[in-house]
A protein has these predicted regions:
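A short alpha/beta connector and helix-capping loop motif
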Residues: 190-200
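Non-heme Fe(II)/2-oxoglutarate
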Residues: 3-92, 112, 212-217
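Active-site region of the double-stranded beta-helix
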Residues: 70-100, 108-122, 129-135
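Short conserved micro-motifs at the rims of enzyme active sites and ligand-binding pockets
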Residues: 36-37, 187, 207-210
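Residue-level detector of short, conserved catalytic/binding motifs and their immediate flanks
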Residues: 102, 123, 194
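Catalytic core of non-heme Fe(II) oxygenases with the double-stranded beta-helix
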Residues: 105-175, 202-214
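Short beta-strand His + acidic residue motifs that chelate non-heme Fe in jelly-roll/DSBH
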Residues: 113-116, 182-189
């Protein structure tokens, strides 16, 4: 294929139907003693629930209302703030947003989470409260025809991959469309992997007023 390069082409490389995913390292800047105490408070709250758990495998908090707990107030405000910035970045026009669910996940050695989506929500996210980068989150291209023809790759890039993984780096947040299929790889660490997950729904008019399939949330 090298002979192709002798021609001078003018190309406009347009990436259509984007799947927008956001990775935020150092999501909670632990600079001051106060910020560190916030993180420690969230860890203690989850650890206390973990000690009194009713089951042992792939543990999650029983209720998904951590955003209503005082220990998660600062974290919740951070999630709302960055979610509003994302929606503004994507040029959506909404009245407001709301967290519908927030819960904690604890994965022990050899545990994993199977493929799933987060139905009836617009954005979803996960934050790694405690992790040594084992048990990455993995996203899969949901388009059924995307793997019909897959040429061999010179290099693996965002442009030619149908599966992408992101390490569960401590203090990292990953925010993605709720419809995007994802799973969590097996935890091969001897330490527990603690994450906080949440869902975001938009408020306001969905669709255009002249469309029959519009709605007002």
């Amino acid at each position: 294929m090298e002979e192709v390069y002798k021609w001078r082409y003018i190309m406009d490389h347009q990436k259509i139907f984007a799947t927008n995913l956001f990775v935020l390292d150092d999501f909670l800047p632990q600079i001051t003693t106060a910020e560190k105490s916030i993180v420690d408070g969230m860890k203690k709250y989850i650890s206390d629930l973990w000690v009194n758990r009713k089951y042992d495998e792939n543990w999650q908090t029983k209720s998904a209302d951590l955003h209503k707990k005082k220990e998660f107030k600062y974290f919740t405000e951070s999630v709302i703030g960055v979610s509003k910035k994302i929606i503004n970045t994507l040029d959506y026009n909404v009245k407001d947003i709301a967290i519908t669910d927030m819960w904690a996940n604890v994965l022990k050695d050899q545990e994993h989470h199977p493929t799933h989506t987060h139905s009836n929500n617009f954005l979803s996210g996960t934050y790694y409260l405690q992790s040594d980068q084992s048990a990455s989150i993995v996203f899969h291209d949901p388009r059924p025809a995307a793997d019909v023809i897959v040429p061999r790759r010179k290099n693996t890039t965002l442009n030619n991959s149908s599966v992408l993984s992101y390490a569960s780096k401590q203090n990292r947040a990953v925010i993605f469309p709720s419809w995007l299929p994802h799973w969590v790889q097996q935890n091969k660490s001897k330490h527990k992997r603690i994450s906080i997950a949440w869902n975001i729904q938009v408020k306001g008019q969905l669709g255009e007023h002249h469309e029959f399939q519009s709605a007002d949330f």
